[in-house]
UniProtKB/Swiss-Prot annotation:
<feature type="topological domain" description="Cytoplasmic">
    <location>
        <begin position="27"/>
        <end position="288"/>
    </location>
</feature>
<dbReference type="Pfam" id="PF00837">
    <property type="entry name" value="T4_deiodinase"/>
</dbReference>
<keyword id="KW-0472">Membrane</keyword>
<keyword id="KW-0256">Endoplasmic reticulum</keyword>
<keyword id="KW-0812">Transmembrane</keyword>
<dbReference type="InterPro" id="IPR000643">
    <property type="entry name" value="Iodothyronine_deiodinase"/>
</dbReference>
<dbReference type="GO" id="GO:0004800">
    <property type="term" value="F:thyroxine 5'-deiodinase activity"/>
</dbReference>
<keyword id="KW-0893">Thyroid hormones biosynthesis</keyword>
<keyword id="KW-1133">Transmembrane helix</keyword>
<dbReference type="GO" id="GO:0042446">
    <property type="term" value="P:hormone biosynthetic process"/>
</dbReference>
<feature type="transmembrane region" description="Helical; Signal-anchor for type III membrane protein">
    <location>
        <begin position="6"/>
        <end position="26"/>
    </location>
</feature>
<keyword id="KW-0712">Selenocysteine</keyword>
<protein>
    <recommendedName>
        <fullName>Type II iodothyronine deiodinase</fullName>
        <ecNumber>1.21.99.4</ecNumber>
    </recommendedName>
</protein>
<feature type="region of interest" description="Disordered">
    <location>
        <begin position="99"/>
        <end position="130"/>
    </location>
</feature>
<dbReference type="GO" id="GO:0042403">
    <property type="term" value="P:thyroid hormone metabolic process"/>
</dbReference>
<comment type="function">
    <text>Plays a crucial role in the metabolism of thyroid hormones (TH) and has specific roles in TH activation and inactivation by deiodination. Catalyzes the deiodination of L-thyroxine (T4) to 3,5,3'-triiodothyronine (T3), 3,3',5'-triiodothyronine (rT3) to 3,3'-diiodothyronine (3,3'-T2) and 3',5'-diiodothyronine (3',5'-T2) to 3'-monoiodothyronine (3'-T1) via outer-ring deiodination (ORD). Catalyzes the phenolic ring deiodinations of 3,3',5'-triiodothyronamine and 3',5'- diiodothyronamine.</text>
</comment>
<comment type="similarity">
    <text>Belongs to the iodothyronine deiodinase family.</text>
</comment>
Length: 288
């Protein structure tokens, strides 16, 4: 995490405090709701089923998210960082062509397309990563951009409820605006890992201990996307360089065109809005 000076601390403290206050209120409301339900049904459910949000791990995560936002290397109209990412095998034929260096022992293998069963898979903990990582390739984020076409980049992870909730809306954009823009999902570190800071309503995915774990989660997230709304999905490298460069932390949307940032989305989760990207693409489509 970047070094934090006093000025940055003073700038981000109000946001950190307001987010922690929101988490405290959320926990209080959840407790009262469970207590009321228990009194009405004369039964009690363990708090293990309702993890608290205001925890030491949660506050650290909120703090880190604001530090990343303050130190992001992008600005509207500025150059887009060409971060290192890991491409998965089995991209759809409608994806733009790109050049990547195949990883490890499978550099001469042809990626195997995902089967129907794999496409229907939900995000679960998996210890078998060989089949997923065998067709990965080291790439750069801007390898997926084409000249004069907007590239919509969607950063997020399956354990973050707002990201998953708006995934269908994002897939609608992929389907409806394929003629004017390209799309890319960058799978970053888990926002709410099940073994550290789980969120109610989030998919249960543990922390990524190795690149294979992240590639498995990214591959399974791609399986949740409908065929007509599917786009390339890549994984951030384990040094989280894309996450740091773009100041993501939880989820964020960008539009890149000709190497420049044309749309800079708000900080997730509260200002992560797919509808704003839709408005941007509608203006692009109308100008053609």
């Amino acid at each position: 995490m970047p070094h934090v000076n006093l000025l940055v601390v003073l700038l981000i403290l109000p946001g950190v405090f307001s987010n922690c206050l929101f988490l405290a209120l959320y926990d209080a409301v959840s407790f009262l709701r469970r207590a009321l339900q228990a009194s009405l049904t004369h039964s009690a459910k363990g708090d293990a089923q309702h993890p608290r949000m205001l925890t030491a791990q949660g506050m650290l995560s909120v703090w880190r998210s604001y530090v990343l936002d303050a130190h992001k290397k992008v600005r509207l109209g500025g150059k887009a960082p060409n971060s290192s990412v890991v491409a998965l095998g089995g991209h759809s034929s409608s994806s733009p062509s790109f050049s990547c260096a195949a990883s490890s022992s499978s550099s001469h293998e042809t990626p195997t397309p995902r089967t129907t069963a794999e496409a229907a898979a939900t995000v679960t903990t998996s210890t078998t990563t060989t089949s997923t990582t065998s067709s990965t390739a080291a790439c750069r984020l801007l390898d997926f951009a084409r000249a004069h076409r907007p590239l919509v980049v969607n950063f997020g992870s399956a354990s973050u409820p707002p990201f998953v909730e708006q995934l269908g809306e994002f897939c609608d954009l992929v389907r409806d605006f394929a003629g004017v823009a390209d799309f890319l999902v960058v799978y970053i570190e888990e926002a709410h890992p099940s073994d550290a800071w789980p969120a109610p309503g989030g998919l249960e995915v543990p922390r990524h201990l190795a690149l294979g774990d992240r590639c498995v989660a990214a591959s399974q997230l791609r399986g949740l996307m409908p065929p007509l709304g599917r786009c390339p999905v890549v994984a951030d490298a384990m040094d989280n360089n894309a996450n740091i460069d773009y100041g993501v932390s939880y989820e964020r949307l960008y539009v890149i065109q000709d190497g420049r940032i044309r749309y800079l989305g708000g900080k997730g989760p509260f200002f992560y809005r797919v509808r704003e990207v839709k408005s941007f693409l509608e203006s692009v489509k109308a100008s053609r």
